[in-house]
Amino acid sequence: WSMPIYPTAGHDRDSLANALFYHYQIHGVKLGFHPVYRLDKDTSGLIVIAKHGYAAAVLSKSIEKEYTAVCEGVLKGEGTIDVPIRLKEGYTIQREVAKDGQRAVTHWKVAGGTNHHTLLQIRLETGRTHQIRVHFSHIGHPLAGDDMYGGHLNGIGCSKVLFVHPVTGHRIELTCPPQDDMMALVQ
């Protein structure tokens, strides 16, 4: 099930912002809607929303995210992809690996797989648009489900978020299991 973060054409009533403001309304709460980070359109999983802009700004500088993804083909062990990414010339959304792009670093570790797909745990050192998708396509293992960069089916989700609560100072760890359709690819 896909839910956009903000209302868009075709999704003017079923966004996360709509749902949260409805929740605020029925509970008589007046708070803001401040996503701490964004997820690409077809990425499932955890999203952290701050109640205040200041909290979002503080959290955005210190939040740690881990992704679970399924790529096509077989990878072994762990590794780092450290190649720059830029907007692909002539496109408004699509990115590509290019020497004159922005630095982009992706750390990955194999967590399972089959003869056709590999389950990965991924941590980003940088946060470029489509970074995971572009990097794995670049090394010849596009994400399952990524029709823009060469994959098939749905293959990425934000599975873990760690942060220090901006008011209490407590360390918070949130986890979310991968979607069933993604896990079916590696079982």
Which stretches of residues belong to each language-model region?
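RNA pseudouridine synthases
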Residues: W1-T80, P84-G90, D181-V186
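Conserved positions in beta-strands of structured domains
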Residues: V36-Y37, R86, K109-G112, V164
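Short coil-to-beta-strand transition motifs
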Residues: I63, K76, A98-T106, G155-I156
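Intrinsic-disorder/low-complexity, polar/charged segments enriched in Ser/Thr/Lys/Arg/Asp/Glu/Gln
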Residues: E66, T80, R103-V105, H117-L119
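A structural micro-motif recognizing beta-strand termini
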Residues: E72, Q121-E125
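Pseudouridine synthases involved in rRNA/tRNA modification
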Residues: G112-H117, E125, R133-Q187
